[in-house]
Amino acid sequence: MNHGRRSILVKSVTAAGWMTFGLETFAHERTGTSSNAMRLISIGGALTEIVYLLKANTQLVGVDATSIYPTAATRLPNVGYARSLSAEGILALRPTQLIATEDAGPPIALRQIGDAGIPVSMLPSGHQFIDVINRVRTIGRLVHKTDAAEVLASRLLLEWSSTQKRVANSKINNTRVLFILSQNPSQLMVGGEKTSAAAMIAYAGARNAITRVSGFKPLTPESVIAANPDVIVLTDQGMKAVGGISGVLRFPGVKQTRAGKEQNIISLEAMYLLGFGPRMPLAVAELNLLLQHAMA
């Protein structure tokens, strides 16, 4: 990046494709980088999964802490959590390209990486299926795997069509679902509207039990009881952290809900459930199936 007053160009991806706009942050995109020479760092488990599916993983020299699938990604140098990146640690890996979702940071770290002349491509972290397809195609262009990206996009579109048919036939549209984010038994954090959890619940054919708040917010016992979810969903990591189903039932108010009384409590791995990566159609189908079983 130019650290002076000059406006530079950053590539942003929208549903319509590439769009450039002026900012005084991040790096300009360098041209002429060959795929063989690329040293790629991927910030975001969903992005890393796409890189592997495009068979561009030989270009990877580092990933973030959420890049746990496939297992091979965990053997790469880890640059930490997406929201607390260290420019020094990233630059030590001598990358020639960094990809990340727009919620990565802090901005100063990304600015420092850009100042060092490293292209930084920020991808929208939207929670719609089309966002998954857009990320596949964008990464395909960045790693010079456009043909493979189109093959993958076509496969995902077929999987998505199949999932949508399954959801439409499942008849769980009145099922009220509460997503608990908490990994701390002393505080109940839930997924309100405009969250990845709310999007997955809706895609799976059910209703979010929390509709009056947006984002991930703490919830009082009275609000939990009033929400009265039919099913409670957690990540596998969250379920383990609170001590399993018995731990979930210890959250104030949960025992008084239908989900608590009937122990309709399910979990899925965090990135699989909330990452909106290439496994998203399968995750929606599995969540739908688990909800059907819980309500049977």
Regions found by a protein language model. Name each.
Residues 191-216, 236, 267:
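His/Asp/Glu-enriched short active-site or ligand-binding loop at hydrolase and phosphoryl-transfer sites
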Residues 44, 102-103, 125, 213, ...:
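Short secondary-structure boundary segments
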Residues 87-100, 221-237:
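Proline-aspartate-enriched helix->loop->beta-strand connector
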Residues 39-93, 97-107, 245:
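A short, structured surface patch at a secondary-structure boundary
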Residues 104-115, 233-249:
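A ligand-binding cleft/hinge motif common to bilobed small-molecule-binding domains
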Residues 1-17:
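N-terminal secretory signal peptides and thylakoid transit peptides that target proteins
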Residues 33-39, 108-185, 208-214, 263-296:
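Extracytoplasmic substrate-binding proteins
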